[in-house]
Every structure is written in structure tokens, then in C-alpha cells.
Amino acid sequence: MLFERAKSVFPGGVNSPARALKHLPSPLVAKAASGAYLYTDRGKLVDYCMAFGAIILGHAHPRVKKAVEEQLEKGWIYALLTEQEVEFAERIRRHMPSVEKMRIVNTGTEATMSAIRAARGYTKRDVIIKFEGNFHGSHDYVLVKAGSGAATWGIPTSAGIPQEVARLTVVVPYNDIDAFIKAVREVGDRLAAVIVEPVAGNYGLIIPDVEFLKALREETQRAGALLIFDEVITGFRVGLGGAQGLFGIRPDLTTLGKVVGGGFPIGIFGGRGEVMDLVAPSGPVYNAGTYNAHPVSIAAGLAVLKELETGEPYRIANEAAERLAKGVEDVAGRLGFDVVVKRMASMFQFYFKKGDVKTPQDVRESNEKMYLKLHEIALKHGVYLTPSQYEVNFTSAAHGREVVEETLAALEKSFQELQREIG
């Protein structure tokens, strides 16, 4: 069995924890992907994980494939400056004017780690504020959780992180303006930066209160600290201008990833010119990497940006998410399930609970076991939902009307089967 072989060479049998699918007997094994579909050891599945949001045009999109093939013909790594990466950065800046200068790295984790380092270098301060339920990668600065109280110095969420490092991060409830302002006052002149997912997409889908985001902007400016928008998920997913364009808020620094790499490894951190000019080689904030601005990732990302600039992929993906969100709400309601559905652009998630979902606490109060059971049942009916209520479902430009109808029919059967199982 492949999973047994995998467990003999990988911790837990996988190379990222989210792939473990612990509620199933074994993880899904991918064989191929095309358009809206995954081909796996469990058959052909309509994919709503979409590589946790990295794919927006659809799997193996022909124009992305062509761009990558053309790059491979010319070589795949030079460790030198290329014209393509300059054009790529110029396009990003055109759509996100706050990103005046940027550094292209390889992962979202690298991007947030480097953005925080740049903020500390610029402000000459050491403490950062992050928010409960926001995920910013797997580095020591941000793998922390709140202790007891509304705003607390961080506690490591992973073994191997020194307490002294975690104490440089203060964790505050998401969407809570009063708690945030209190934390800013308590940290005082040690506050280097506030990092936030402007739309929380790593604890389910939590839509921000716009006044909350405005308060982050106002208070960081007042405190002389930097505001970092982590748009690894939302950047070029919710629109060409990202969440910052959607809400009209200009952060000091931004991190990007996922969509802008076209399915290849990428991360970007960038923002105000005077901050980014502190990054090596023009300044003392160190960042370097053999694979930075990898030509294949740049080629794929450039192809994706050109497609997105037509607007058509957004129209299809957003319409699909809207129809699916309404469809889930309808079928769940008809069958007597208490379900809350949240959607933004081509992102959606649903929760088995009464009332709204505005905070991480609301997500925790949802019936996670019910979601996991539905996920398992939906696989039998040919639909791969995102594997946890703490993740987000994504649509793409490949999720046209026929795919959506196929999905809704399968989900109706899945909810009916769930109803029979719970009696």
C-alpha cells in the first residue's frame, strides 16, 4: 500500500500536515489534474481545494502550460536577473500600487518571515501583533497562540520554538477593535508591525469588519508601526487589487503567493520603497535565495496575470462560488440542517451551526465532526471539498455551469446520505 511506503519515508506519511486527511483511512493519492478535476486513487473528483487556493484558472491550464514549456526550452534556472521577472513585478505594482518595490521569494512562509524582518529593521523595534485564527506560515515569528485574556503575549504552537521568540508576538482576537487598540497601547513603542489576513482564510472563511481594518491602519500610523497585509490567499484571488483594493486600505507591506505563482512555488513581500530599500543588497535587512524569482514560477505567474487581466476568469469563478454557496444553503435548509455559508469572490465555506460566523470562536463552535463526515461522503459522490472546516473552498475559471450543476447534484445526495446516517 502506497500510504505504508509513504509513512516509512515521510513523517505521518505526507509532506504537509493538511494532506494527511486524518478523518479518512488514508490520504488521497493524486494521479493527475485537469481543469476542475482531480484524478485520484478514489477516482475522478471535482476539486474545491484547488491546491489550497493556488489554482485560479483551473488545473493544467493550456496557456500556463505553454508558458512553462517555452521557459523550459530556454533553461530553468540562471540565478541572474531576467527581463521576465521585471515585467512580472511591474504588472503586480500596476494592480497593487502599495507594492512600490518587492522581493520575489519561494513560499508564503518566506514572504511573511521576511516582511516581519523588514518591518523590524525599518522601525528598529521588536514586537509584532498578529490575530487569533490568522495563519502566516510555519516560521517561529508567527507560530504562536493566545494565552488567557483578550490580548496576550504569544505561546508557541509548535515544539522547538523558544518561549523568548514567542514573547515577541502579541495575539489579539480577530475583528475586535477594542482589544486591538488596548494591545497597541500596552506594547507601546516596542511595536514594529501588525500582520493580518485582511480576509481570514486559514480558519475557515471569516469576513472582516471594514471598520476593523480601518482601525488597524489608523492605529499603526499613530504608533509609528507598519501594517502588513498577508495576501498570500487573497492576492489576485479576490480581484486584481487584492483585498486592499477591495477595501480601499493601503498597507505598508504586503505578502503574496499562491495565485501569482500559477501553481509553482512563489512568495513575494513588498511595499513602501523606503522600507524595501533596506533589503539587501541595497540595505542591511538580509534576504537571499538561489531559487528567488525562479524563471519557471515567473513564467507561470506572468501567464496567470495576463489571463486575469481579461476579467473573464474572475467572472466565471465568482459566479460558480456564488451559485455553490446558495446551493449548499438551499439543500441544507431543505433537509433540516443548521448551516451558515460564507463567501467572498471565489472563496466559500460552510459551517454546521446556528447564527453567524464572524470570529474564530464562532468557527470552533461549529460541528466539525459533521463537516468531516460530509467531506467523506462527498468523496464517494465525486466531490473533493476542502478537507476541514478550518480551510476554505475555492472555485476557478474551470468551474463552469456544468461543473457547478454536477457538484450541486452530488452534494444533494451527500447531504441526504448524511441525514440518513445521523438519523
Swiss-Prot record:
Subcellular location: Cytoplasm
GO cellular component: cytoplasm
PANTHER family: GLUTAMATE-1-SEMIALDEHYDE 2,1-AMINOMUTASE, GLUTAMATE-1-SEMIALDEHYDE 2,1-AMINOMUTASE 1, CHLOROPLASTIC-RELATED
EC number: 5.4.3.8
Keyword Transferase: no
UniProt lineage: Archaea, Thermoproteota, Thermoprotei, Thermoproteales, Thermoproteaceae
Example GO molecular function: transaminase activity
InterPro entries hit by this protein: 4pyrrol_synth_GluAld_NH2Trfase (IPR004639), Aminotrans_3 (IPR005814), Aminotrans_3_PPA_site (IPR049704), PyrdxlP-dep_Trfase (IPR015424), PyrdxlP-dep_Trfase_major (IPR015421), PyrdxlP-dep_Trfase_small (IPR015422)
Protein name: Glutamate-1-semialdehyde 2,1-aminomutase
Highest taxon above the source species: Archaea
Keyword Lipid metabolism attributed: no
Coiled-coil regions listed: none
Pathway(s) the chain acts in: Porphyrin-containing compound metabolism; protoporphyrin-IX biosynthesis; 5-aminolevulinate from L-glutamyl-tRNA(Glu): step 2/2
Family, per entry: Belongs to the class-III pyridoxal-phosphate-dependent aminotransferase family. HemL subfamily.
Main location: cytoplasm
Catalytic activity: (S)-4-amino-5-oxopentanoate = 5-aminolevulinate
Gene3D superfamilies (alphabetical): Aspartate Aminotransferase, domain 1 (3.90.1150.10), Type I PLP-dependent aspartate aminotransferase-like (Major domain) (3.40.640.10)
UniProt enzyme class: isomerase
This protein's UniProt keywords: Cytoplasm, Isomerase, Porphyrin biosynthesis, Pyridoxal phosphate
Cofactor(s) required for function per UniProt: pyridoxal 5'-phosphate
